[in-house]
Swiss-Prot record:
The protein's name in its UniProt record: Ribosomal RNA small subunit methyltransferase A
Family: Belongs to the class I-like SAM-binding methyltransferase superfamily. rRNA adenine N(6)-methyltransferase family. RsmA subfamily.
Cellular compartment(s): Cytoplasm
Encoding gene (name): rsmA
Enzyme Commission code: 2.1.1.182
Annotated organism of origin: Xanthomonas axonopodis pv. citri (strain 306)
Catalytic activity: adenosine(1518)/adenosine(1519) in 16S rRNA + 4 S-adenosyl-L-methionine = N(6)-dimethyladenosine(1518)/N(6)-dimethyladenosine(1519) in 16S rRNA + 4 S-adenosyl-L-homocysteine + 4 H(+)
Length: 262
């Protein structure tokens, strides 16, 4: 039984509503909600994922920015389970406060136009997040999961993999959506690492090193990082200054950012 409803997609909000039952079921199976868990869906839209999750779990919190979807979501959810709706921009939601001591499981078909900001916002609250299952443009998922040497390995890859285990799960074709996007989508799982194993001394310094390294990716690290790293930084971190950012492992960036010169 599908309780999702029809509503026009708003291009300004980057909305593409999932409509294919096969892929809806695959996402719900990947999430595999269990009793006692705190599920939070970002951008429920027409409820394609919302209502199957609610039916399976009994309770769900959703964050929806589009006010026109609030009433139909509330009405359709009433006979199914306890749906809590937060009508706000997801980037303004404090996930740590929302978790309230119980790590949240984030789920969502993320709007293409703000997917990266949402990912970095979730990272800021990683200690309060158990895991994340997101659908995004396939090219973004490819970048998230890429390794050194790949043409799509970059800032997003390093920043996410430093704090999370990233696993690309499956591709979702344009025809599964209404309206269909122009590109393939993919579902990705992110599991935040134990904070005790994330050996980053200064998060801002780490982010600065990664950003600068990939900001001019054709340059050697010596040149790309000249404003923030001295030759001694490379020596102490055992990182070759004549290498390029795309050749470094995540651990190399962490060591380089952690170096403190006397």
């Amino acid at each position: 039984m599908n309780s999702s409803f029809s509503a026009p997609a708003k291009k300004s909000l980057g909305q593409h509503f999932l409509a294919d039952r096969y892929y809806i079921d695959r996402i719900v199976q990947a999430v595999d909600p269990r009793a006692g868990q705190h599920l939070v869906e970002i951008g429920p839209g027409q409820g394609a994922i919302t209502f199957p999750l609610l039916r399976k779990h009994g309770a769900l919190t959703v964050i929806e920015f589009d006010r026109d979807l609030i009433a139909p979501l509330t009405e359709a959810a009433a006979p199914i389970g306890a749906l809590r709706i937060i009508h706000r921009d997801v980037l303004s939601v404090d996930f740590t406060a929302l978790a309230d001591g119980t790590p949240i499981r984030l789920v969502g078909n993320l709007p293409y136009n703000i997917s990266s900001p949402i990912l970095f916002h979730a990272l800021d609250h990683a200690a309060a997040v158990a895991d994340m299952h997101f659908m995004l443009q396939k090219e973004v998922v490819d970048r998230m999961a890429a390794g050194p040497g790949s043409k799509v390995y970059g800032r997003l890859s390093v920043m996410l993999q430093a704090y999370c285990e990233v696993t690309a799960l499956f591709v979702v074709p344009p025809g599964a959506f209404r309206p269909p996007p122009k590109v393939d989508s993919a579902v990705v799982r992110l599991v935040p690492r134990d904070p005790a194993t994330v050996l980053i001394n200064d998060r801002r310094r780490f982010a600065d090193v990664v950003r600068a390294g990939f900001g001019q990716r054709r340059k050697t690290l010596r040149n790309a990082l000249s404003a923030i790293c001295e030759p001694a930084h490379f020596d102490a971190a055992q990182v070759r200054p004549d290498a390029r950012a795309e050749q470094l492992e995540v651990a190399d960036f962490i060591r380089l950012a952690n170096v403190e010169l006397a």
